């Protein structure tokens, strides 16, 4: 017979239960007493510190993982940002160089018109800038009876741009005029190539400060001249020296002026087509 069966009908079982209850009661009292004296309180703080430690360690691990992910994202962003600005700079440089090339080509074609506009706006090179025309100046000085005694030597110069197969020369070397007088000079141009060439000329007067008194009445500058192979033409220059040249103190000591022309090639056409067009004769059918 087992011990539990023997104790079932006896009082010993109730005794043991009471003993078990009384054994738990002092523990509770003891714990409460120690709690009042701080022992259980310290145990509670210990357990809390354990929980805080494990909680902080778990949060530390999460923070470390988030910091690692953030550093990886930052490195990727830096790598992308270093590649992206370089590509943007390359595209900007390409656009800039393309614009420069097109700008240079445009300036090449617009050089002569821009130079003409500049001369007309500033009076550079003897271009008439004042509102009074040359004819009005001549008439005004003729009526006032302006007399000048100073003689000015005007020399002529001719040049052609590189690659232009023209012979371009002044007919006369120089002309002597007085302020208030007009003079006529000629330039000769000849096409030495085997193809038609169209050219346009620019000019300048030196010294430049005397250019405002050098007025051209008739000139071939800034006008296209087309010459066939072997063709030669004479181009006149009719100019006038303002009488105020003599009274201007800035012109003291200036007795020589140089008028220079430079021809530039505008276009070159096909010689074969031109010759065929000029020599084309209608064929008559014979019966």
Curated annotation (Swiss-Prot):
Record has Cell membrane as a keyword: no
**UniProt-listed GO biological process terms:** pollen germination; positive regulation of cytochrome-c oxidase activity; post-embryonic root morphogenesis
Output one GO MF annotation. copper ion binding
Q: Which domain of life is it from?
A: Eukaryota
- Mitochondrial matrix compartment ranges equal 81-92
Q: Which InterPro entries match?
A: CtaG/Cox11_dom_sf, Cyt_c_oxidase_assmbl_CtaG
Transmembrane stretches in the record are 93-115
What keyword terms does UniProt attach to this protein? Copper, Membrane, Mitochondrion, Mitochondrion inner membrane, Transit peptide, Transmembrane, Transmembrane helix
Where in or outside the cell it occurs: the entry states:
Mitochondrion inner membrane
Q: What membrane topology does this protein have?
A: Single-pass membrane protein
Q: Name one GO cellular component term.
A: mitochondrial inner membrane
**Side Mitochondrial intermembrane, residues:** 116-287
Which residues form the organelle targeting sequence per the record?
Answer: 1-80
Task of the protein? Exerts its effect at some terminal stage of cytochrome c oxidase synthesis, probably by being involved in the insertion of the copper B into subunit I.
Entry's family note: Belongs to the COX11/CtaG (TC 3.D.4.8) family.
According to UniProt, the name of this protein is Cytochrome c oxidase assembly protein COX11, mitochondrial
Species name: Arabidopsis thaliana
Q: Which gene encodes it?
A: COX11
């Amino acid at each position: 017979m087992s011990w539990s069966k023997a104790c079932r009908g006896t009082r010993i079982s109730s005794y043991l239960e009471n003993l078990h209850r009384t054994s738990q009661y002092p523990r509770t009292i003891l714990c409460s007493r120690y709690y009042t004296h701080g022992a259980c309180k310290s145990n509670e703080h210990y357990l809390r510190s354990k929980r805080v430690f494990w909680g902080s360690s778990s949060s530390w691990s999460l923070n470390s993982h988030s910091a690692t992910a953030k550093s990886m994202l930052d490195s990727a962003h830096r790598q992308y940002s270093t590649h992206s600005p370089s590509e943007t700079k390359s595209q900007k440089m390409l656009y800039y160089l393309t614009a420069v090339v097109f700008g240079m080509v445009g300036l090449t074609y617009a050089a002569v018109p821009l130079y003409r506009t500049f001369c007309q706006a500033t009076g550079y090179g003897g271009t008439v800038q004042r509102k009074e025309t040359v004819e009005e100046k001549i008439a005004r000085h003729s009526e006032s009876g302006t007399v000048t005694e100073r003689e000015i030597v005007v020399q002529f110069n001719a040049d052609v741009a590189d690659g232009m197969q023209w012979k371009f020369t002044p007919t006369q070397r120089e002309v002597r005029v007085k302020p208030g007088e007009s003079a006529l000079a000629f330039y000769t141009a000849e096409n030495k190539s085997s193809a038609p060439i169209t050219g346009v000329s620019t000019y300048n007067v030196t010294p430049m400060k005397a250019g405002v008194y050098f007025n051209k009445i008739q000139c071939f500058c800034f006008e296209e001249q087309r010459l066939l192979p072997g063709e030669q033409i004479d181009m006149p220059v009719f100019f006038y020296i303002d009488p105020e040249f003599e009274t201007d103190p800035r012109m003291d000591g200036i007795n020589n002026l140089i008028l220079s022309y430079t021809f530039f090639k505008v276009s070159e056409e096909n010689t074969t087509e031109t010759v065929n067009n000029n020599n084309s004769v209608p064929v008559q059918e014979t019966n």
